[in-house]
């Protein structure tokens, strides 16, 4: 009877281990996918920021547009 109990416990542990290994593989795949998506989003954000900066005129006038100070 003790032998059956031990065998049952070992079988239960093996089953749990197999489930945990599958879960870890699934989580690893999800993290890898998310990392790729995040890298793409970062690149898209960088491009969008560059486009916004390029489309907005500067609030600082160029040297040629500036009027000389009054003491000149």
From Swiss-Prot:
It holds the Pfam family SlyX. Coiled coil: none annotated. Belongs to the SlyX family. This is Protein SlyX. NCBIfam families: PRK02793.1.
